[in-house]
Amino acid sequence: MHAVRAVPLLLVGALLAATACDGDQPQTGGGSGGGTTPSADSGKVAGTLPPLPPGFPTPVISGSIPTFIVALPDSVTTPEMARPWFDYFSWQSFIALNWPADLNQGRGNPLQPANPSIFLNASNSTPVTWGTYKESYELFSQGNARPSPFDSWQVAQPACSNAPQAQGQKVFVMTSKGNSIMDESAEAFSLPLVDQDSNYVRYEIRYNRAQYDTIRGPDSDSTLWLYLLTNLRRHSQLQMPATDSAGEVGSLMVKAAWRQMTARDDTTRYLLAHAQVLNPDGSCTPTTMGLVGLHIAQKLDSFPQWIWSTFEHRSNVPGPGAVAPYSFNNGDSLPRTPTGWANRPDSATLVPRAQRVPTQVTRLNPIPSTPASASTQWVNQLYQGYLGQTVWANYQLVVTQWPTQPQSFAQFGQGLYPAASGSPFPVNGATNTTAETYFQSQQDAYASGGNSCMQCHWNASKADFSWGLLRRAH
């Protein structure tokens, strides 16, 4: 796994985490993990870019997953002031994960990660690195068969009854973030989302090598095959491997939302996947899908409650940086959306397209406009400028959430983090309109623990914040 070289992380005033590296330097690292800033030679970079605030690192076009938070200036004394540096981490992760995949080197490996032109000149239908991670159904929907090794494309129980899965081809089996095979819909996030073309949004959850291999367990000891629920119970203090100070990438989860492309869509503005979509009868239909939402969760040694980043396509809903027409909003003020949504389906049961009503979605929790010198909105504009005419300039970071007071897992004897463990920032409102559509308000999200990544996932702390493992282990 390619990674940017990490350095030790230090707490700053018990509120902030930062590295001991030079915060004025680009995040490049050594060896093949390095990268460079884009140049005019790429033909992809926009013109004038806004000036960087003091101490803010220069964006880097690199296929190496960042493994540390760049050092914060001494003037940064609050989580809000630290936000730009965590947003930088999120954007660098987004670039690395969406780097073209090297399909000749197994799964989860970027192609020439130190060569920016590979990324800047890639087609918008090129398979990306995170897209070759193992999908949830490859891990938890294989009956009594043990899941295949990480690099294998073979599964004991294929998702499609009528079509083999080609190497690297996506198969969408989920109609909500909470379920895995589409008829399993008892989870909290199980109600589907319908776009303006009356098509269901499809979801996938993927695990990188470190996390997948931990859940699958070592070949030498079947008692450690943690996908078995009995073993999960016995391992009450299960910890996923974390990215360490040597730069070895630890556990990383990706959750993605996709919508079906139609004649009205400008498909050049989306990451595309020519995929198989699972139907209720078990058959699959070839469909061109476009990426509309992406959650990234990465565990670092000094952030045991993980760092949570969420991105969306700029044409999802109205708001700063948005581009009409919208995929999940009709552009009108009606129907009203006091909690961020209207026309929510009554049931998880899928119905024919003619019976569906498009879900009206608005962003209840705005993309942060603070701190004034380098807000999340500003960081988005910065990276969109660096990404120029690539497809990635059509995406935006919605929010980054992290523990401001990281707490070691070992502090809790039963392997359970308490609520609000790590003092997350922001506390509330860290939501994605495509993944937490119906949980944007604190009222709607109360039963799930709260309307943010960390508030929700602390309930799965027994499985080290992995709802997929906690719910789907069998």
Show where each model-derived region lies.
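C-terminal motif of bacterial Sec signal peptides marking the signal peptidase cleavage site
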Residues: 17-20
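Bacterial N-terminal signal peptides that target proteins for export
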Residues: 1-10
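Conserved small-residue
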Residues: 25-29, 33-455, 460-474
